[in-house]
């Protein structure tokens, strides 16, 4: 063997594998509520990490799985600091962790009191930075028989862009609370 070649014994053992899933806590720098990079990755601390400080140095960036992802389109929900997440490992490789879900727990309860509201489903966000439990956006579906409802709450503004036609059918009353101002920039025809 030439003197300038470093001797390395052959690898006898295969790379370790992590099968199954683990839970972890989303972490970031002090004072932040959301911490991510341009790819939507986050940092976590595993419960077995006794030396971690639950900050932005607790792990490397970890990718977050989503049901739908493409070039400049898809779904995005960045787990926030303090959320409990599920971590899997691609092909069992401990160097390739991926966030595959989030969990409710005693510190982060579901948005609708259960089991009383078990017929409700939806999306409820939390205003950031420093929003309270009263600051949120929400789309909620009530599926209880004879009380079915789709509820939309915008904490501030609701903007709707319709590129073509809008058709609505209101079976009974069409109520608008508060003052209203209507601006028409071109023509309007009422029948």
Language-model features and meaning:
Residues 3, 18-191:
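Structural signature for extended repeat/solenoid scaffolds and their inter-repeat hinge/linker regions
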Residues 1-18:
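OB/S1-fold single-stranded nucleic-acid-binding modules
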């Amino acid at each position: 063997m030439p003197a300038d070649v470093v001797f390395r014994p052959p690898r006898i053992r295969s790379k370790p594998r992590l099968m199954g899933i683990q839970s972890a806590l989303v972490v970031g720098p002090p004072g932040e509520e959301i911490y991510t990079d341009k790819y939507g990755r986050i940092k976590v601390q595993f419960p077995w990490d006794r030396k971690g400080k639950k900050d932005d140095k607790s792990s490397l960036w970890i990718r977050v799985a989503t049901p739908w992802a493409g070039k400049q389109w898809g779904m995005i929900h960045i787990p926030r600091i303090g959320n409990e997440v599920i971590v899997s490992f691609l092909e069992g490789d401990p160097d390739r962790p991926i966030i595959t879900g989030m969990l409710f727990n005693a510190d982060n309860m579901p948005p609708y009191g259960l089991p009383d509201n078990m017929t409700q489903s939806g999306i409820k966000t939390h205003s950031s930075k420093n929003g309270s439990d009263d600051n949120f956006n929400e789309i909620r579906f009530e599926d209880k028989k004879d009380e079915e409802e789709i509820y939309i709450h915008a904490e501030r503004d609701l903007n709707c862009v319709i590129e073509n036609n809008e058709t609505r059918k209101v079976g009974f009353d069409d109520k608008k609370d508060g003052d209203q101002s209507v601006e028409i920039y071109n023509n309007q025809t009422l029948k």
